[in-house]
Each structure stands twice: as C-alpha cells, then as structure tokens.
C-alpha cells in the first residue's frame, strides 16, 4: 500500500478501532516531554492506548508524505469520563516499514494544557 493510504488507514483505525494491527513488534516511540525513545510494541500500545481511549474523534488537518515517512497535524477531540472535553492539536511523525507496519512514532502537543485537562481544570 502506498504510504499516504497507509497513514490514512491508520488514522481511520484510531477513530474506528483496530489501530493496534498496524504496529510492528520492533517499535520506537518518542514524546514531546522527553528526549528518551521508548522501545517496543507493548510500550506504544499502552501509551497510545491510554490517549486513544480518551479520543472521541481524530481529524487529520494536514498530511505530508515522503517515502515511508509521514508528518501529520491532527486534531483530537478528547473526553474524560466526567464529560469534560478538549480539542488538542497534535503533530505526529510516523515511519512505516516495507511490510506496511508502523515502526516509529514521535508526537508533539501542548503537554501543559493536556495535564490540566487530565486534572479536570
């Protein structure tokens, strides 16, 4: 599958379910709050899974593709169990391997705003 369609399919799966099927075993995961690269599929499934569980909707605002790499600006509508909602823009940098598996993701977003949201502020 070409990389653009692959990324679009992944983001559709974030909305509808099944995103886990895209993730390779050998995976690198980076976040804006750390220089550390987390390694392994399970680490990503846990971290992204907690975030995606709050997501009511993901809208891809911009998508740039070069080879097997993708840069996306996405808007997530998040909701806490209390009903409180937040729209959060997230820059996501993805890399797919030749077998169409997601092998790397680095994300950037306003962590302060997200933490306040999680604290119910």
Predicted segments with their positions:
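Short, cysteine-centered beta-strand-loop-beta hairpins and adjacent loop/turn segments enriched
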Residues: 53, 78-87
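A short hydrophobic beta-strand element
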Residues: 67-76, 88
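Short, low-complexity N-terminal intrinsically disordered segments enriched in polar/charged residues
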Residues: 1-17, 21, 120-121
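A solvent-exposed, acidic/Ser-Thr-rich amphipathic alpha-helical stretch
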Residues: 5, 16-68
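Short beta-strand edge/turn micro-motifs at domain boundaries
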Residues: 93-118
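Short beta-strand segments enriched in hydrophobic/aromatic residues
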Residues: 76-78, 109
């Amino acid at each position: 599958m070409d990389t653009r369609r692959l990324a679009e399919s992944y983001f559709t799966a974030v909305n509808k379910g099944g995103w886990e099927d895209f993730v390779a075993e050998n995976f690198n995961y980076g976040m804006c709050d750390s220089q550390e690269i987390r390694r392994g599929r399970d680490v990503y499934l846990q971290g992204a899974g907690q975030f995606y569980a709050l997501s009511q909707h993901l809208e891809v605002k911009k998508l740039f593709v070069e080879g097997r790499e993708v840069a996306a600006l996405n808007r997530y509508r998040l909701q806490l169990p209390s009903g409180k909602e937040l729209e959060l823009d997230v820059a996501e940098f993805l890399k797919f391997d030749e077998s169409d598996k997601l092998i790397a993701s680095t994300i950037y977003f306003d962590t302060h705003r997200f933490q306040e949201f999680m604290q119910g502020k």
